[in-house]
């Protein structure tokens, strides 16, 4: 049997503030349609708490406009959820006729960092990785840590 080393990371929860999300939402991305779509999917995820896998399957049948809610069964945990459409979500969903753009996850995660870079999210984040008894510290700017969940 092969032996594997366990790599652990020590981090506090990293999140974006409402101001940072607003800055990302307000970015002029007219020069890059794909990045604009990624931004809209990302913002929708932030304000609904939906995982990327659920956002990628969101369709008009999940939207209840009368009650301003999203009603769907989460893919990962197979649980039905009802989510209020708040902040930017109604505007974004309407923009795409209630059917968000379908973006491959690897492209999404690769390019979503660019949103943070353009929004100048430069707060320093320290990540400590443990490999056996050794601890390796590395510092990232906040934009480098952005990804889907």
Where are these regions (language model features)?
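Active/binding-pocket-proximal capping segment
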Residues: 61-64, 87-89, 129-135
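Short, basic (Lys/Arg/His-rich) helix/loop patches that form interaction surfaces
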Residues: 30-32, 98-102, 110-149
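Generic anion/oxyanion-binding catalytic loop in active/binding sites
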Residues: 10, 44, 97, 144-145
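Basic, Lys/Arg- and aromatic-enriched nucleic-acid-binding interface segment
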Residues: 1-52, 56, 66, 76, ...
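A short, basic/aromatic helix-end/turn motif that makes direct DNA contacts
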Residues: 57-63, 149
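Glycine-rich, flexible loop/turn motifs
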Residues: 12, 79, 142
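Basic, alpha-helical nucleic-acid-contacting "clamp/cap" segments
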Residues: 23-27, 64-69, 73-120
